[in-house]
Every structure is written in structure tokens, then in C-alpha cells.
From Swiss-Prot:
GO BP terms in the entry: lipopolysaccharide core region biosynthetic process
Lineage: Bacteria, Pseudomonadati, Pseudomonadota, Gammaproteobacteria, Enterobacterales
Name of the protein in question: Lipopolysaccharide core biosynthesis protein WaaS
Known role: Probably involved in the biosynthesis of the core oligosaccharide region of lipopolysaccharide (LPS). May be necessary for the attachment of a rhamnose to the LPS core by a linkage to the KdoII residue. May also play a role in a lipooligosaccharide (LOS) biosynthesis pathway.
Keyword Amino-acid biosynthesis: no
Length: 311
């Protein structure tokens, strides 16, 4: 069985795939730009583009077998010629949700896949849907290479990285509270179409995932501000668990979950602001191996492979 990751291009995704290649027979295939360029041109004139998917399969996926697995994520499934590839290939097909999506998204894409894995566990009534935990891109064999001891910084360092997405006001307000309590801020809000106000925390471009890891490891506290309808765990939450950091978040679903501990999480909208200073200055214990494994790429890949072997 060969596992094909199709158009996974983010740097943290590539890091994960390289790790998984040590354990599984995996190929990472990216659609050449010329295919997407041609697809745009012929789509504008209403020309059928199924042939383009077949041509790509002939040149790049010609050796695929029916018991192999294609894995596509929600960020790319509706882009380029991915749908044409899925229509014209005979193998197991998986859609792996990494972001919050609506029911319409599921309905539009369900027929292209054998299984859709949902980390928020919101669509379990659909026969194509299976629950899976959100997963961290760094594997269990690699996490031990990082220093997970408490950072003895002269000032507690709070780290935020993410696109604006209309969150700048909340971030600015939190920054004021943290500064008042003596924290040093490493806040990086990437400008997007929602950015209308000026802020010293705005940056023009996203930083690399390796740099993100470096800053995360250097921090004492990570900040995670999510959309109102998001219920699953973000990458920031998983960073806090795997790198043994404290986390300030507005994700109320953390409270009462299996990952919750009062020493690790300060939940905006649940915890009193009066408790923030104590939280900042408290320590937190690392999670055990078995608890982390549930959110690892090792577990994710094992789950997917097992689901098809058992069929």
C-alpha cells in the first residue's frame, strides 16, 4: 500500500510528511503550475476539463493501485484540478479536515471520497464521516529532540502568530493586560483583508514554521484566539501540549475536555481576569506520552491505514 499526499504544500505539512516517510511508503505529489494555468483558461470558456485530470494521472500517478490511498486536505480540495484527479482515479480517497468547515462543504465534496475525517466531530451522522483527533505535525520520535523544560526568562514571554481575521482588537486588548502584568510580548499578526487599524503587532508576511517553533520554544505562554464557531483544537493548542507551554485561549470547549488543566489553560470568557497574574507565574507539568500520542501524526496515519486494511 502506497499513500499519496496530493498538494500538501505548507512547510509544516511537508515536515510531517518527511517524518511519516520513515514509517510508511509515501509519495508527496504536487500539481505542476502549468496544469492549473491550463485549467483556469479552459474553465473560463466552459470547456470540459476532465481530460486534464486524466493527463495528470497518466504522467504522475500512473503506477497507483486500487488499494493505495490518496489524501487531500480541505484547503486544496476545491482548487486546481484536484476534483478532476479524484473523478478519474481508482483507489481509496481520503479528505482530511484541518479547518472548520460548514455542512455545505461536506455535501459538495462527499461523493469524491471514501472517508472524510473530521477533527471537530460535528458531522458524524454522515455515513462518509469518521472522527479523528486534530494532529500535530511533529512526530513522537521527533518531539524528544526539543527542549521541553520551563523557560527561565527574566520576563514571561507571550507568543502569538496568526492572520488578522478580524481578531486584532481582541489581541490588542489582551496585549495591554499582559504588558501591565510584566509580560514581554512576541505578537505577530499577519495583515489580511480584515486589517483596517494600525497596530505595532501587524506584520506583512507569515513567518516559516521552523521560526514559529523557535519562538514557541522560547516563550512561556502561547496565545490562541479562534473563530466563534470553532470547537476543535488548533495547531496552537497542540503546540502548548507537545512543547509543554501554557496557553491563553478563547476556545471555551477546552474547559472540561480531556486536555484541560487549570495550570495550562487560561480561558477568556470563562476565567476571571483577576486570576491571570497567578496563571502567568505558575508552572505546568508535561503531558504523558499516551496522552500526546492521540494527537500525533503517528496516530493519524495509523488510523487511516487501519480503516482501509480492515475493509
Amino acid at each position: 500500500m502506497t499513500i499519496y499526499f496530493i498538494n500538501w504544500v505548507a512547510d509544516y505539512e511537508l515536515k510531517m510528511i518527511q517524518y511519516l516517510k520513515k514509517k510508511y511508503k509515501i509519495k508527496n505529489i504536487t500539481t505542476p503550475k502549468k496544469y492549473n494555468w491550463i485549467n483556469k483558461k479552459i474553465s473560463k470558456i466552459g470547456m470540459d476539463n476532465a481530460w486534464l485530470g486524466r493527463l495528470f494521472i497518466k504522467h504522475y500517478l500512473n503506477d497507483i493501485k486500487k488499494d493505495d490511498i490518496i489524501i487531500i486536505n480541505d484547503s486544496v480540495v476545491n482548487k486546481g484540478i484536484n476534483k478532476q484527479i479524484l473523478k478519474n482515479i481508482n483507489c481509496h480517497k481520503v479528505l482530511l479536515l484541518r479547518n472548520t468547515v460548514g455542512e455545505d462543504f461536506i455535501l459538495d465534496n462527499a461523493n469524491y471520497f471514501d472517508i472524510i475525517y473530521d477533527f471537530e466531530h460535528r458531522f458524524i451522522g454522515n455515513e462518509k464521516i469518521k472522527a479523528i483527533e486534530q494532529f500535530f505535525p511533529i512526530g513522537m520520535d521527533e518531539i524528544r529532540n526539543y527542549s521541553l523544560s520551563d523557560k527561565n526568562n527574566s520576563q514571561p514571554i507571550c507568543f502569538f502568530l496568526g492572520r488578522d481575521k478580524g481578531r486584532l482588537q481582541i489581541i490588542n486588548e489582551l496585549a495591554e493586560r499582559l504588558t501591565t502584568l510584566g509580560c514581554k510580548l512576541d505578537f505577530n499578526v499577519v495583515k489580511d483583508k480584515t486589517s483596517s487599524t494600525t497596530s505595532k503587532y501587524l506584520i506583512e508576511k507569515q513567518i516559516s514554521y521552523e521560526e514559529n517553533i523557535r519562538r514557541t520554544l522560547n516563550a512561556n505562554i502561547i496565545v490562541d484566539i479562534t473563530k466563534e464557531n470553532q470547537s476543535g483544537w488548533t495547531l496552537r493548542i497542540l503546540e502548548a501540549l507537545f512543547f509543554n507551554k501554557k496557553l491563553i485561549t478563547n476556545n471555551i470547549n477546552v474547559f472540561g475536555s480531556e486536555i484541560y488543566s487549570e495550570s495550562r489553560f487560561f480561558i477568556i470568557g470563562h476565567d476571571d481576569w483577576d486570576k491571570l497574574e497567578y496563571f502567568i507565574n505558575s508552572s505546568v507539568k508535561p503531558m504523558d506520552y499516551d496522552s500526546l500520542y492521540k494527537f500525533s501524526p503517528d496516530k493519524m496515519m495509523s488510523t487511516i491505514v487501519s480503516d482501509f486494511i480492515d475493509k
